[in-house]
UniProtKB/Swiss-Prot annotation:
The protein, known as: Uncharacterized 33.4 kDa protein in ribosomal RNA operon
Organism: Thermofilum pendens
InterPro entries associated with the record: CBS_dom (IPR000644), CBS_dom_sf (IPR046342), Diverse_CBS-Domain (IPR051257)
Xref: Pfam families: CBS
Keywords noted in UniProt: CBS domain, Repeat
Domain CBS stretches: 10-68, 88-148, 152-207, 226-284
Amino acid sequence: MRVSELPVGRFPPLAVVPSSSRVLDVLVAMGRNRVRHVPLVDERGVLKGMVSARDLVDFLGGRRFRDVVEARFNGDVYKALEQTGVEFLKYDPPYVYTRSDLREVIELMVERGIGALAVVDEDLRVVGIVSERHVISLLANVETHVKVKEIMTSEVVYLSPMDSLFEGMRVMSERRIRRLPLVSGEELRGIVTIKDVLSYVSREDVLARLKEGSRSAVYDTPLVYISSKPVLAVEDDVDVGLAVSLMKKHGIGALVVTHDGKPRGIVTERDVLTRLPRVKGVEIFLDEATKTIFGGRVTF
């Protein structure tokens, strides 16, 4: 099953920016298109690098914020965004060709711990992008006989609805996570994703405030203000295939996992991709005819 034949992926990508761009250009492209990876290309469209949402959040509120925004620009976020070249954030991404098969895509994602791969032609020109969300969507409506609690992430970092945007970005950067459930007591009040953060910061009115020097007005914003609502949750004994179907239906990458209605963890597209194949008794099959992935427990 070649990448070019898959009923998933984005061809061409929603956002591609020149490798000579500023960090501000990538923030706007990523935030307003609500994507987590932006390929960088030269004037011929040849892949020259990639910037991830984690890189940007680290620049806005993590280690790079301290090393660059505060140390070099005296805390002026807008000036740092406008004057720092994207070369500072880029990484050299693994990629796949249009002729690559799905198994190669999955193995590369799992082996390198990455969530998206640029798809290139024989001349290394970017023609598309395939993400872990695209891949696991092929598992939708498949009964796996594996419960969500068997693959979920139990050690979840929770924040309060009134914690600030800056605190959220700091935690995302330091803990290398993309989602923060907001909990008051034991009640789930919302969830903030890395896409929510970048979508908010890239808004014209928010950038205008940063340009004016009103960083605190932006960075002190309560997380609940930018959070995704309502929060979708599943009980921990639900089949993984049903959880994937819910993610696909609502266009999201994670579900809060509950037990008797109380939050107990989170299951993400990354959990499905990397942990499901490791569950004892589970086999993964690729159906070339229907271009579908079948995964499930075949021995108990």
